[in-house]
């Protein structure tokens, strides 16, 4: 096998060109660029299309690009196509993780998330087995095309979108359709529709949802509701006197809704979430250098590559399930993160110390480092959503994941230009640094998530109280004038 394919799953391409360090490094970054774009654009795509649509259409796109790649004989064209494949793959993975965190019960979220993620390890072992038995990568890709297409169809038929995300985006039509879909899947569609048509509670809820989508009418309705007392004549005077202020109230309503929707800039602006973003971004970057580095370095280990790759993915499968138990136990998310990051730091330090003395020990600790690192990764996924308020959770996660993708772009250059022994020392330092940084994080296990950033909530409450005081003051003035009349 030539050095060209050090970072590729393909082992039988031949283009007759010579290899160099820069070329090897660039080849290693191509897949990571697709992952980087998938993480960076994820919050935009999710806000526009919803998680269910991403899972369906991107599975189909993933299958289509895999199918196209089979017919390309040029190695470099293939790598460009593979970049798009990784883009679809990362968006699919992100959507799956987000949907799991939003539709699963809080008590069992981490355990179910870990069980679902363990499918990545099973998929890796299945891929290694297929490649070992079939040998020809094209036939392996055909199996991948079929599996991806079937997965997309199953998701389209049997899954519903995240109700939380529909409410955050003020998309009440999608929210209603998802409720109807859930009723249909449980065989209660007729009962649901009859309830909407006949039950006053359902009608009122549906009417409220429709009112929230009409900004221009919301302020007058609020005034009518607030002033529905026995003093009808006084209320008419108050309503007419406040008509001049209605445009201002409408603008405030729109600004308030805009703030509640959330953005990445809000995370950078407010300190209560900014420090979480920075710490998790550093942690994900460090963890990802080890994640991508251990995958690339598997071909340099002693023994059969197929055996080593199978053990690597077996470690992934075990790690996801182990992390679910630890993070959901009394240890909690924060302490679990510290234990796993410190563990892989120690394992990498041992590999650095014995690298030139005993290769068998290096192989053993190599898989131990992989096991503990994947355990930490799985806790990251749950912790990221629980630590951010709901309004900005997708933005925070997307930024953290983007930082992890940057590690995938950088690590091939580090491995190519730095001696392998000292790469393990870098991993060890990263593990210790992350462990120390996590002391500044807060525990999230079993705690309800906040709807909005704390500072924004305080600002909105102040404005609301100020507006109520002004309304009361104006009301007293108008009532006193009315009495004089």
How would you name each of these model-derived features?
Residues 36, 63-64, 121, 125, ...:
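Small-residue-rich packing faces within the transmembrane alpha-helices of Major Facilitator Superfamily
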Residues 135-224, 428-467:
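Central mid-sequence intracellular linker of multi-pass
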Residues 50, 71-76, 134-135, 354-355:
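Helix-breaking motifs and short loop linkers at transmembrane-helix boundaries and internal kinks
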């Amino acid at each position: 096998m030539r050095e060209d394919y050090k970072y590729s799953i393909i082992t039988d391409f031949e283009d007759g060109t010579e290899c160099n360090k820069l070329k090897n490094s660039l080849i290693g970054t191509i897949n990571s660029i697709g992952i980087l774009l998938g993480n960076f654009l994820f919050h935009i795509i999710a806000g526009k299309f919803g998680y269910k649509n991403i899972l369906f259409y991107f599975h189909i796109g993933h299958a289509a690009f895999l199918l196209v790649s089979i017919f390309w004989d040029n190695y470099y064209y293939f790598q460009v196509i593979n970049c798009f494949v990784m883009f679809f793959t990362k968006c699919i993975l992100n959507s799956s993780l987000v949907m799991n965190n939003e539709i699963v019960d809080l008590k069992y979220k981490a355990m179910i998330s870990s069980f679902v993620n363990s499918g990545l390890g099973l998929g890796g072992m299945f891929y290694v087995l297929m490649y070992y038995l079939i040998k020809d990568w094209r036939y392996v890709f055909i199996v991948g095309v079929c599996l991806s297409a079937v997965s997309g169809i199953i998701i389209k038929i049997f899954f519903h979108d995240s109700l939380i995300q529909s409410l955050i985006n003020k998309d009440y039509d999608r929210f209603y359709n998802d409720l109807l879909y859930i009723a249909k899947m449980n065989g209660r569609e007729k009962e649901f529709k009859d309830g909407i048509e006949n039950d006053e509670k359902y009608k009122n809820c549906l009417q409220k949802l429709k009112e929230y989508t009409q900004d221009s009418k919301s302020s007058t309705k609020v005034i009518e509701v607030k002033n529905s007392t026995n003093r009808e004549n006084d209320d008419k005077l108050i309503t007419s006197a406040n008509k001049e202020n209605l445009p201002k109230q409408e603008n405030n309503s729109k600004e308030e809704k805009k703030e509640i929707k959330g953005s990445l800039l809000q995370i950078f602006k407010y300190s209560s979430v900014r420090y979480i973003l920075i710490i998790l971004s550093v942690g994900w970057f460090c963890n990802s250098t080890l994640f991508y580095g251990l995958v690339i370095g598997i071909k340099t280990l002693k023994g059969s590559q197929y055996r080593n790759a199978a053990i690597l993915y077996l470690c992934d499968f075990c790690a996801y399930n182990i992390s679910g138990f630890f993070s959901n136990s009394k240890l909690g998310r924060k302490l679990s993160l510290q234990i796993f990051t410190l563990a892989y730091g120690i394992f990498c330090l041992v590999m650095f110390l014995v690298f030139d003395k005993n290769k068998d020990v290096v192989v053993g600790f190599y898989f131990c480092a992989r096991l503990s690192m994947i355990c930490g990764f799985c806790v990251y996924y749950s912790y990221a959503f629980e630590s951010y308020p709901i309004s900005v959770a997708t933005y925070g996660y997307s930024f953290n994941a983007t930082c992890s993708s940057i590690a995938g772009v950088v690590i091939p250059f580090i491995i190519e230009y730095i001696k392998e022994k000292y790469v393990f020392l870098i991993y060890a330092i990263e593990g210790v640094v992350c462990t120390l940084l996590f002391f500044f994080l807060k525990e999230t296990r079993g705690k309800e998530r906040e709807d909005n950033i704390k500072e924004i909530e305080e600002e909105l409450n102040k404005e609301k109280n100020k507006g109520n005081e002004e309304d009361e003051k104006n009301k007293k003035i108008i009532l006193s004038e009315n009495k004089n009349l």
